Amino acid sequence: MSVMSRKIYGDEIIKILKDYDFTTTEVADALNKTGVIPLCYPINHNHNQVEYGYTRTMFASNSSNWEVHEDVFKINKNEIPIIFTENCHDRAIIGELVVRYMVEKNGANAVVIHGLVRDIKSLIDNKLPVWCMG
């Protein structure tokens, strides 16, 4: 039975993506080019490749990042935290210290923020794998 004719889950999906070396274009085409998180781009051009891992959803709302700071300690190795924002307008949700903790201490593969970040120059200079809206 081929991979494409049966349901696959979790670690098996990640293994297949790595083994077959799928590109971001192929993944986007498979997702119908929906732009899963529109306007979210890598801040480091060397991070245009696909990052693999389980995701951990986090939330920031009403211009507060309190819940994000509580959840930072729950991130596991190889996870990709995705931080969604609601009513945060032009406020940066996290910066270099929190990103470094998630990536270097907890072992996150990347960090995705559906919102703004601070310390952009440091994030770029340290080549941290961050996708954000600005």
Segments the model singles out, each with a brief description of its role:
Residues 2-134:
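Feature captures the catalytic cores and cofactor-binding loops of soluble hydro-lyases/lyases
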